[in-house]
Amino acid sequence: MQVTETLNEGLKREIKIVVPARNLEEKLNERLDNTKDKIKLNGFRPGKVPAGYLRKMYGKSFMAEILNEIVSDASRSILAERGERSAMQPKIDVEEDKKILDGKADFIFSLKYEVLPKFEIKDFEHIEIIREIAVIPEQEIDDQVKRVLSSACNYSLKDGPSEEGDRVTIDYIGKLEGVPFEGGAESDAQLILGSKQFIPGFEEQLVGVKAGDMKTISVKFPDNYSAVHLAGKNAEFDITVKAVCKSDELKIDDEAAQKVGLESLERLREVVRGQIESQYGSMTRQKIKRQILDALDADYNFEIPEGLLEIEFNNIWAQVNDDLKKAGRSFEDEGVTEEQAREEYRVLAQRRVRLGLVLSEIGMNIGVKVSEDELKAAVFDQVRQYPGQEKEIMDFFRNTPEAVANLRAPIFEEKVIDHLLARIKVTDKEVTVEELMKEYDETDLTEKKPLKKKTAEKVSTKKKAPKKS
């Protein structure tokens, strides 16, 4: 087998392989000889089939198998001999010649691929980050305890107007400039007035309503609302009040805590505090990652494989266009032209690919492994996110190995981030909840905001829960 490098430019490689016809003939004869005792043909005793007849019957199919084996083995062995790692599966181009299957012509094919870039991992000691730790107000814990206990309260219908603390059942349709927007409608929504469950201004306008009332309210979505096509927008909601219920007197004591499954009020407060700390801890973790990745992004500027870049860009671009379509918006609405957006998202794709390679290299150097138990836990975590569809989701992962493999990357990344956190300078800083949440919605592990606004996501008038890290 003759191996010749025909292209070596940047990360691109092309290798030409020539397997002489005589070598193919030798392999075919060996294959025929090894199988002659195993093949049974009518009219011939086992092992007595003439070689010429056997070749006529099976020669081309055996040769096709041999050619496939040569190509498969060559892809692995050539890369190993050259000490290269292919960024993607090499593209194989075969020169067509019918004589090859008869062993009368050389088998010529080429491998085209991009290598993963080689770069040195730099020291991490110079990286400095701020770890913001939210100081949780006791009032927030008090309010959450009340919400938990109110969920166990009994409610009874009332005839009079609603008051703060009452539970109203409503149908609503949200509109922007008179046009209903996606995700802005719900039937039989239950809302406890004063719970701050919905966006500011929504609940307050339902104080004083009675069952059977129809009302249109006006609200303004917060400027930092996560569905950005609604952020800062004025909207109207057509509301039909279906029921108003008054709760029993809310008691905040050990007996009330026991109704929600905890032994005491003190224990309930501990659980609530832990949940809130975990919630804000996820935000802290996300902002830490952003700082680390920004620092790594500044440290590395190597060439990346075009194939990986195109895949990442196409994934981002498809998601962007899908989000815009769902939101009924255009690039012009976002303050950019499509050409500008392409350029900005390509920069984002470059950042993601480069950071992915850096994190992967760090992980390989320190021996990061993802265990099967960790993958199983990740699968179950995904399943829990779809209540009522557990069987379907589990079947999906069971029948789609690549989906399980995709869960490996974030686990791997978390372990690398933990490794870096132990080696960089981290300064803890106590902040208010408001300070922690400032610009939190703009935080993304591997991106800098490419557009003035992000594209849309599923809309709800309810407040958004914090992101998971």
From Swiss-Prot:
GO CC terms: cytoplasm
InterPro entries per record: PPIase_dom_sf, PPIase_FKBP_dom, Trig_fac, Trigger_fac_C, Trigger_fac_C_sf, Trigger_fac_ribosome-bd_bac, Trigger_fac_ribosome-bd_sf, Trigger_fact/SurA_dom_sf
GO terms of biological process kind: 'de novo' cotranslational protein folding; cell division; chaperone-mediated protein folding; protein transport; protein unfolding
Catalysis performed (reactions): [protein]-peptidylproline (omega=180) = [protein]-peptidylproline (omega=0)
NCBIfam families: tig
Notes on the domains: Consists of 3 domains; the N-terminus binds the ribosome, the middle domain has PPIase activity, while the C-terminus has intrinsic chaperone activity on its own.
Protein name per Swiss-Prot or TrEMBL: Trigger factor
Gene: tig
